[in-house]
């Protein structure tokens, strides 16, 4: 059986906060940190919208959630290395607040729900941090900018505000069964939403209608939060990588690019599908779709633990070059075009990124200052470890703003046939994105969303 394949069964347990705390502590100690140290983290504060008394949308701090599994605002936690004790602090009962919001979770309820050793109210944070014979000789680890003014670390000999954030970011790269189960569940819910959008596309008159279909499908399955702002792009709007207006009329455009994913208990899905709005590709859009699908399949098949992500990104470009040469959009030799980086005009972004609590998850070691345009926006650099989850999202785009400077560049324009290119502007963009779990021997694809040509055209026509 695949890892966490029966995700509902896995999710009957508790979020593994204690294992995460141990993992982070080990990372710190292995890097020369204090074996007697203490981790201190704060939840996000509940805030009001500016100039009114309505609550702003709440998003839990991911660093806090990773060591707690707790989505309550205004909370705190500590993890003591020597005693292996994880303590959560949650807001006490405020009588006036109960009138409006009902009774909050009690410490007893929190201790039963979360993978922690003890739970107290936030009134006890500073007494808990007060001096003892142990803390007087140890180090407190915290994240700068995430320490309340009223919190004091005076009892600790050392205060380290550098290692903890980095430690958590690296530890988040490799996922537990529980985390994989959450991502699987988010993918299943999002897949249902993608299918519903495909079925609704032919009758839609505006991009916003299809965004509404996606959101409804997620919310009615209790996935009320989106991992990111959906991209619902018809026709040439799909050439804008992070198009978020989602409000253009749907008229004669051929393709719809839908990049959308819900989150489940703070864990994201990130799925892109491109499909013909009426169920039939044009010759040009079908040709580009076939290239992108080939790019994705070959790159996914090349993955396993220890593979260099840079090399997979290069593979995607070489497949794109070969395909565009066959169509006549590019001309010349594959290696010459690759060396000139001409394919970046059509595939300007990185092949993918780590996925977890954030859509663009931590630990990727991106180098946005890279002078090589092919790698500047590659969000993961280096080898992929087992149990990492990464998106594989190749694309080919016909964006005038990006391509036209290449047509004016003496080195680049020799590789592009402008007459052939002219037929493809209306394609806009094609991107196909799956969420891939890397294993020791290969991969598990966490994204069951249809992408084969016969599948997606049949779904659209069935609407």
UniProtKB/Swiss-Prot annotation:
Recorded hits in InterPro entries, A to Z, give: Aminopep_P_N (IPR007865), Creatin/AminoP/Spt16_N (IPR029149), Creatinase/aminopeptidase-like (IPR036005), Pept_M24 (IPR000994), X-Pro_dipept-like (IPR052433)
List, separated by semicolons, the cofactors it needs. Mn(2+)
Task: Give the Pfam families listed for this entry.
Answer: AMP_N (PF05195), Peptidase_M24 (PF00557)
Reactions accelerated catalytically: Release of any N-terminal amino acid, including proline, that is linked to proline, even from a dipeptide or tripeptide
Name the positions where Mn(2+) 2 binds.
259, 270, 433
Q: Which SMART domains match?
A: AMP_N
Q: Please list the residues that bind Mn(2+) 1.
A: 270, 393, 433
The note on cofactor binding and number reads: Binds 2 manganese ions per subunit.
Q: Function of this protein? A: Catalyzes the removal of a penultimate prolyl residue from the N-termini of peptides.
Query: Under which name does UniProt file this protein?
Result: Probable Xaa-Pro aminopeptidase PEPP
The EC designation for this entry is: 3.4.11.9
* Gene designation: PEPP
Q: Name one GO biological process term.
A: proteolysis
| An annotated Gene Ontology molecular function | manganese ion binding
- Keyword Methyltransferase assigned to the entry: answer is no
Q: Does the keyword Cell wall biogenesis/degradation apply?
A: no
What keywords appear on the UniProt entry?
A: Aminopeptidase, Hydrolase, Manganese, Metal-binding, Metalloprotease, Protease
């Amino acid at each position: 059986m695949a890892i966490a394949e029966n995700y509902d069964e896995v999710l009957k347990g508790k979020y593994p906060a204690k294992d995460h705390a141990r993992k982070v502590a080990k990372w710190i100690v292995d890097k020369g940190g204090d074996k007697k140290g203490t981790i201190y983290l704060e939840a996000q504060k509940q805030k009001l919208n500016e100039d009114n008394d309505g609550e702003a949308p709440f998003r839990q701090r991911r660093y806090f959630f990773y060591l707690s599994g707790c989505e309550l605002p205004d909370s705190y936690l500590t993890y003591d290395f020597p005693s292996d004790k994880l303590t959560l602090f949650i807001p006490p009962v405020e009588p006036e607040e109960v009138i409006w919001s009902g009774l909050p979770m009690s410490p007893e309820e929190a201790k039963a729900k979360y993978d922690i050793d003890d739970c107290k109210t936030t009134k006890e944070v500073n007494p808990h941090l007060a001096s003892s014979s142990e803390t007087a000789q140890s180090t407190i680890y915290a994240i700068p900018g995430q320490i309340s003014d009223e919190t004091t670390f005076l009892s600790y000999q050392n205060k380290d505000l550098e290692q903890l954030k980095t430690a958590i970011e690296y530890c988040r790269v490799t996922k537990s069964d529980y985390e994989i189960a959450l991502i699987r569940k988010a993918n299943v819910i999002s897949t249902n939403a993608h299918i519903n959008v495909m079925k609704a596309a032919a009758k839609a008159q505006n991009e916003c209608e299809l965004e509404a279909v996606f959101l409804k499908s997620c919310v009615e399955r209790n996935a009320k939060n989106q991992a990111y702002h959906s991209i619902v792009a018809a026709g040439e709007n799909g050439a804008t990588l992070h198009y978020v207006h989602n409000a253009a009329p749907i008229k004669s455009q051929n393709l719809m690019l839908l990049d959308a994913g819900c989150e489940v208990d703070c864990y994201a899905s990130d799925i892109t599908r491109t499909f013909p709005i009426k169920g039939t590709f044009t010759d040009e859009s079908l040709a580009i779709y076939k290239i992108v699908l080939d790019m994705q399949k070959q790159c996914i098949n090349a993955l396993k633990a220890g593979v260099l992500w840079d090399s997979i990104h290069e593979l995607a470009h070489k497949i794109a070059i070969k395909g565009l040469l066959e169509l006549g959009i590019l001309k010349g030799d594959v290696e010459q075009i690759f060396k000139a980086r001409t394919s970046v005009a059509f595939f300007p972004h990185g092949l993918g990124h780590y996925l977890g609590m954030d859509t663009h998850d931590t630990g990727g070691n991106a180098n946005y200052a890279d002078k090589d345009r092919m790698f500047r926006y590659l969000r993961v650099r280096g080898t992929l470890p087992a149990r990492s989850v990464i998106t594989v999202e190749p694309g080919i785009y016909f964006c005038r703003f990006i391509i036209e400077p290449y047509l004016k560049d003496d080195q680049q324009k020799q590789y592009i046939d402008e007459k052939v290119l002219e037929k493809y502007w209306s394609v806009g963009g094609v991107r196909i994105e799956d969420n891939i779990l890397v294993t020791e021997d290969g991969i598990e694809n966490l994204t069951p969303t249809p992408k084969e040509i016969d599948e997606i055209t049949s779904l659209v026509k069935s609407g």
